[in-house]
Amino acid sequence: MSPMNRQRKNKSNVLNEKDERPGCIIKEKSSVRSMAKTQPTSGRTISLSEINKPIALSKKNTEIKAAVEIQNRLTKKMAKNSERRKKMAHGPEMTAQNRTQERIDFVEFLDRHYQVMQAGVSTVKVHKMHYTKEEFENVIYEAQTIFSSEKALVDIDPPCVVVGNLHGQFNDLINMFILLGRPPETVYVFTECVTSIPKCGEEIWALFQRCFNNLPISALIATKILCMHGGLSPALTCLDELRNHPKPIRNPFRGIVNDMLWADPDPSVFEWKTSSRGSGFTFGTNVIDDVCKRLGVELIIRAHQMCFDGYWVLSGRKLITIFSAPMYCNFYKNTGCVLKVDETLGIQTVAFVPESENIEKIIEEMNRVWDISIDCIE
C-alpha cells in the first residue's frame, strides 16, 4: 500500500491522537481559497544521461541502416551537448569581477510580479513575466552570494512559513506572498527540491545550476523543528554533520545529502529499506522517534510526496509531509498546504483550496480535508 493510500485510510485516526509531549503545538487548519487558476506545468523531459548506445543492424536493409546512422549521429551530438552542459554547470562561480551589468532595483523587480496578480479574484488574467538576461544574472548573483555565505544547515528564527513542493506553479507562489505576507517581512522556508531545465539558454541554465549547488540541505527552526525536502538518512548521527557539510554540493548520488533529498517515510517499514525510487531509503515510524530523540528535535517537516489534503501526519505528530501546489498540474483536485510557525513554536496549517466546481465536496469525499474539529496538542 502506497503512503498516499495509507494516508487516506489512517489519517482520521492519526489526526485525533493525543500527544502529551510538550513543545510544538499543531493547531486546526484554516482554509484559504486559491485566487487564480493554476497554469499547467506539465511537460516531458528527456534525461540525457539515459541515451541509448548506437544500434548495430544488418547491412541488408539500407533504409534501416540510414535511419540508424542518423540516430547514432544524433545520439553522439546529444551526448556531446550533455558533457558541455555538465562542464558549464561545474564551471567558475559568478563573481563581481565577471559580472558587468549594474544592480537592479529588487523592490521594483518584485512589485512587477505582484502587480499582475489580484488576491481573491479568479477571473484576473495572469500575464507571463518577461526577464532580460541582465535581470537573470543579477538575481542569480545575489542569490548565490547569500547561499554561499550560509551553512548547509540554516538556523531559522520563528515566526516563519514552511512551504512544500510547488513544482513551478509560480502564480500560486505569488498568491501565497500576497495572502500570508511578502518577503522579507515574512520569512519563508522552502523544502522544494529545486531543478533547472535547459530551455532558457545554456548560459543562463548553467548559472542557475551553479547557484543551486550552493543551496542549503536543510533548515532548523528554533533548534526544535528540522526541515528538509525528502527525509532521513541512516548516516545522519548529529546536526553538525549537516551544518559543516562542504559546499558547493554537486550532484550527490549517495550519502547524507542524497538520502535527505530522496527518502520517504513508510509506516509499513520497521527501520530502513531501499527506496523503490532507485535512490535513498524508506524509513519507519520507529526511526522517526529515534532520530528526534538523538538530534534533540521535536518535529520533522518534509515535502517530496503529493498529499490530496496538502499534508500528512505520522508518528504521533513528530513528522509532517506538506505539499503546497494546489490543483497540481491542473489535473489533480488536491489542496495545497503550508505551515505557519509562530514565536512559541505553535504550528497552524493553512490550506490553499483550488477554485473548481464542487471542489469542497470532491476533496471531502476523498478524505474530509479541512476539518476544523481537529484537536490541538496541548
Swiss-Prot record:
Q: What is this protein called?
A: Uncharacterized protein C30A5.4
- Record's CDD domains? MPP_PPP_family
Disulfide bridge map: none
* Domain of life per record: Eukaryota
Q: Where is this region: Disordered?
A: 1-23
Q: Name one GO molecular function term.
A: protein serine/threonine phosphatase activity
Amino acid composition bias (Basic residues), ranges on this chain: 1-11
Would you name any one GO CC term? nucleus
What does the record list as coiled-coil region(s)?
Answer: none
Instruction: Please give the InterPro entries that the UniProt record associates with this protein.
Output: Calcineurin-like_PHP_ApaH (IPR004843), Metallo-depent_PP-like (IPR029052), PP1_catalytic_subunit (IPR050341), Ser/Thr-sp_prot-phosphatase (IPR006186)
